[in-house]
Design a protein with these regions (language model features):
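Membrane-proximal basic amphipathic "stem/tether" segments
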Residues: 156-159, 163-217
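A structural motif corresponding to the C-terminal lobe/cap of the Radical SAM core domain
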Residues: 1-176
């Protein structure tokens, strides 16, 4: 999409294009290389795409895979910092976070997952179990390389991020509600103290968060 001309971008905008989903995947160049998706994606190119879409009023919806081997914690923190860069550049950008789940393809990532004790189900009954349904949604807590403390860090970061930058896809959120969410989360976001945001959890019970990956405009 970076090769599209300004005229093409303008035509897409004028035709009603509001949002584009992008698999940004990671804020780590090394992780992107290890994913080997066959493209030339880099964190810098992701930022350039976000910048360009902002100039045309088109919302980028970016998905990130958190906690990639061989160092899931360092990988997660690097991508968390990158997400902050994205939001600084374009506050309207939608962020979707998934936990790393392997695919059964030969490569470093899958080999390292197997070394941690990971194995895919062998029967249909195992595949349709609740644990593996969660796995298919990339939100499972059973993956051995993502320890519970790291999962909690990611969950807390996501809650603070979603309060400070409420999704633009939720038309139920009035201006007043958005201001309340931003006000109560601002000190945590700016100080990077994400741990145990109990006040935001309580607030989200009153103002339920609508996930952009399951709902649209």
């Amino acid at each position: 999409m970076m090769q599209y001309s300004d005229r093409t971008w303008a035509l897409m905008r004028d035709a009603g294009l509001k949002m584009v989903f992008l698999g940004a995947e990671s804020g780590s160049l090394e992780t992107l290389k290890r994913m080997d998706k066959g493209g030339q994606m880099t964190p810098e190119k992701t930022l350039e795409m976000v910048r360009r879409m902002k100039s045309y009023g088109i919302v980028p919806e970016l998905s990130f895979v958190m906690g990639n081997p061989p160092d899931p914690e360092a990988d997660a923190h690097q991508t968390m910092n990158f997400i902050r860069q994205v939001k600084q550049l374009n506050p309207a950008a939608e962020i979707i976070m998934y936990l790393y789940t392997p695919v059964p393809l030969a490569g470093d990532l899958y080999d390292e997952a197997q070394a941690e004790g990971f194995a895919f189900p062998q029967t249909l009954e195992e595949w349709v179990s609740p644990a593996w349904l969660n796995f298919s949604q990339r939100r499972s807590l059973t993956m051995p390389w993502i320890k519970r403390p790291l999962h909690k860090q990611l969950h807390d970061f996501e809650r603070v991020l979603n309060a400070y930058y409420p999704t633009s896809t939720d038309t139920r959120l009035t201006g007043a509600r958005r201001r309340v969410l931003k006000l109560l989360s601002s000190w945590r976001y700016h100080t990077r103290i994400y741990r145990s945001p109990l006040e935001l959890r309580a607030l989200h019970r009153l103002i339920a968060y609508q996930r952009p990956e399951t709902s649209g405009f």
